[in-house]
Amino acid sequence: MEVPPRLSHVPPPLFPSAPATLASRSLSHWRPRPPRQLAPLLPSLAPSSARQGARRAQRHVTAQQPSRLAGGAAIKGGRRRRPDLFRRHFKSSSIQRSAAAAAATRTARQHPPADSSVTMEDMNEYSNIEEFAEGSKINASKNQQDDGKMFIGGLSWDTSKKDLTEYLSRFGEVVDCTIKTDPVTGRSRGFGFVLFKDAASVDKVLELKEHKLDGKLIDPKRAKALKGKEPPKKVFVGGLSPDTSEEQIKEYFGAFGEIENIELPMDTKTNERRGFCFITYTDEEPVKKLLESRYHQIGSGKCEIKVAQPKEVYRQQQQQQKGGRGAAAGGRGGTRGRGRGQGQNWNQGFNNYYDQGYGNYNSAYGGDQNYSGYGGYDYTGYNYGNYGYGQGYADYSGQQSTYGKASRGGGNHQNNYQPY
């Protein structure tokens, strides 16, 4: 068998730069030489790849084992988290010292030392602030006559407790001082109370005819306690429709507590029920519940609930109200409006009542809820706690009621109920 002769013709190289020694080799073994311009860039690729690999490895390790940062925070999955061990209380040094001293005081009280040289005054060093808060000493003697206690009216809205204390300290040592503020807005209500250590200091204050503080004349008066005053158990219900039956009244007011007596006043001229009544409970708790809401829907009308006042309080206030303020007449004999309505001043004698609080400030205090100055109230009988405080309530008797018969032809007469 004949062997074909070897090819003498070799194809030309594909690239001119290919070496001649490779021309006779198979093309599958040949690789072109990389361009010269890429050669300087190749060394920098290796470090970059190494850095990327290191980052990937670090992220993998971090995900498996979270590392702690400064302050105790940890990183897991690329997010910061706050472990339970990081809950620390950062307090200033002064707060820490006060807390440590208070703890030491409590320990000393529970386990008093055998050494008698440690006095109770030392133990009370940090507890005096809580035990003798503002007004605490004044409230402590509210049921007793204290000759060193004074009522200060006509204060400026800008007068602070410090200003009042500094002014009155020139007359004697001030043991306690408080300025009453609105519980909602925190603004001063223009009056306060002061307790002197010595009763003679009160006489010194009263000897001076005129007192001026913060550019305004103030009016200090001696506090007089109303001894033996019982908590209110009797309420006045105004605006009651005469059509409301006694059974309806018992059913509604009996839900608040046990009723002792119900008074339904009658008009002696017309022999008809008047537009108000009185409810007496066996204790004061139902009265507190009733006064939580001023108006109550009873029967077909809305009624207003107030605390009834004794006769002597009413007479005293009527003497003060002569001259215009708190007058019961509502314009030309009672009713305006073409003379068809009958003006019933059914709260005559109950213009001022013992409210749930000194302006709803505290359930133990009675007084003027709408106090806007010091004019027009009884300095000898204002009420702070069990201290009587005179007029200043909104005049309830001036309101008109259309309940009852309407007088014809402009006959406007008033049903003036006298106090019990």
Swiss-Prot record:
It holds the Pfam family RRM_1. Residues 1-83, 96-120, 313-348, 398-420 are annotated as: Disordered. The keyword rRNA-binding does not apply. The modification Dimethylated arginine is found at R408. GO terms for cellular component: chromatin; cytosol; nucleoplasm; nucleus; spliceosomal complex. Disulfide bonds: none annotated. One of its GO terms (biological process) is regulation of gene expression. It comes from the Eukaryota. Its main location: nucleus. The modification N6-acetyllysine is found at K216. Acts as a transcriptional regulator. Promotes transcription repression. Promotes transcription activation in differentiated myotubes. Binds to double- and single-stranded DNA sequences. Binds to the transcription suppressor CATR sequence of the COX5B promoter. Binds with high affinity to RNA molecules that contain AU-rich elements (AREs) found within the 3'-UTR of many proto-oncogenes and cytokine mRNAs. Binds both to nuclear and cytoplasmic poly(A) mRNAs. Binds to poly(G) and poly(A), but not to poly(U) or poly(C) RNA homopolymers. Binds to the 5'-ACUAGC-3' RNA consensus sequence. Interacts with ZNF148. Interacts with TNPO1. This is Heterogeneous nuclear ribonucleoprotein D-like.
